[in-house]
Amino acid sequence: MISCAEQRSRQGEAGRGPAPVAPAFLPIWLPRGCSGILSVPAVAMHSAGPPRAESSMSRQEKDAELDRRIVALRKKNQALLRRYQEIQEDRRQAEQGGMAVTTPALLRPDGLTVTISQVPGEKRVVSRNWARGTCGPGVMNEMVEDEDAEDHGGTFCLGELVELAVTMENKAEAKRIVSEKPTRARNQGTEGSPGGRMTRSPPTQVAISSDSAWKGAWEPRRSRPMGEPPEAGWDYAQWKQEREQIDLARLARHRDAQGDWRRPWDLDKAKPTLQDCSQLRGEGPARAGSRRGPRSHRKLQPPPLLPDGEGRGGQASRPSVAPATGSKARGKERLTGRARRWDMKEDKEELESQEGSQSTRETPSEEEQAQKQSGMEQGRLGSAPAASPALASPEGPKGESAASTASSVPCSPQEPDLTPLDLSLGGAGIPGPRESTCVLSLRPGAQESPVSWPEGSEQQPLGWNDHQAELEVQTCPEPQSGTGLPEPREDRSGKAGAQQGLAPRSRPPRGGSQRSRGTAGVRHRTGRPGPAGRC
């Protein structure tokens, strides 16, 4: 055990030592007799030689490392300063070059020029400079020479100049110029300076390229003579030619040596043939008037004609449309498919409604028919001399036309002219068998005329329809007898009335055919055999 005195003596010796290092104290637990905690320096346990050498070496290493860091920082600062100076110099030269290309007299003062330059090795920097430029021809000549010597391309000098200098972290230097110019041609030019030739450009120009490509793009424009005005379609023609070359090259890449498509999804494309080329050549004028181009040839063909010269549904066929001028069709001619069928259906309904209105206008009412029938029956029951005027009394002109029709119906094509039918009854003094009129009745019905018309002869429509009365003239042989009127046959009139009630009203056929409907059926008997029915 170490006593308290020995500990104090050791502390004194350690405190008188030459080592400047601050002593490190170690806590030691003391016995019960000594109260408190004593700290013993850790340096007293080691010799004084090795700590001095280690401290000196650490100082030298630290100083050397600090010197190296300072040198590196100085080099970096110098590089940054040098780069900043180069950037400022380049920007100043670009501003001078842009102001010295052209004079503001050639361009409008409200034009706009944007220059975006990329300098290698610097981050993106955008600066906007507004300047009013007044340049002389001498300065222009100097700047054009500097432009040829250096790698900087010139910009346009306008009334108000707006420059955007943008530098990117890449190795290529590029400039972007966006200029808005008036559309009218500028015939003026500076004859003394070659820089004036650079002012000839389209109204709006956007160019993004490197310096070498920038200079190469301006060479053909500089080669133009001074007095010649700029060509209107020069830029467009050049652009069109370039685009065609690019398209041809792309198609060549997509095909192999045999001319087949390389990609599997292009196999369904048909190869162009001579017929297709001729069709495309013929469709050229049609495509000029319509953006969508002409319709297919199948839709342009008119509907096929039926043997009777009518279209579908009894409607007259539409005029044919030329295949090459399909885009000029207007109105209903442009309808196809379901719309065309619906339009034809509407036209058919309109035609039927017109025919129905005409038939209602021409057809007398049922009351008039009843009056005519009653009048004819009264005239038939009267005296014999009154029988002949009974044909004209009920109806007037229509009755006369009916009688003339009944008399003018030909029995054979060889004998078209026949004597009028004698409706009067002869006296008793005339011997021999005679023919007398048995029944005169008006019968409305839609029955066809029993008279057979010869082929080649055209039927003349009489203007009567289904509900118009038919004049039926029936002649029966009468035996020779004395004077006296024949008794009217009421049974025949009853049969006619029953037949009138049972006869259905037939619907007129569709289409405007020349067949007459509702003509008077005339049955008569003459001395010679004819096509008419017999009693």
Curated annotation (Swiss-Prot):
Biased composition (Low complexity): 383-394, 509-518
Signal peptide residue numbers: none
InterPro entries: DUF4594
Region (Disordered): 175-233, 263-535
Bias type Basic residues, positions: 289-300
Keywords attached to this entry: Coiled coil, Phosphoprotein
Record field: compositional bias (Polar residues): 201-212, 402-411
Coiled coil (UniProt feature): 60-97
Residues carrying Phosphoserine: S201, S393
Keyword hit for Phosphoprotein: yes
Statement: the UniProt record of this protein carries the keyword Transcription regulation: no
Superkingdom, taxonomy of origin: Eukaryota
Name assigned to this protein: Coiled-coil domain-containing protein 9B
Organism expressing this protein natively: Pongo abelii
The gene coding this protein: CCDC9B
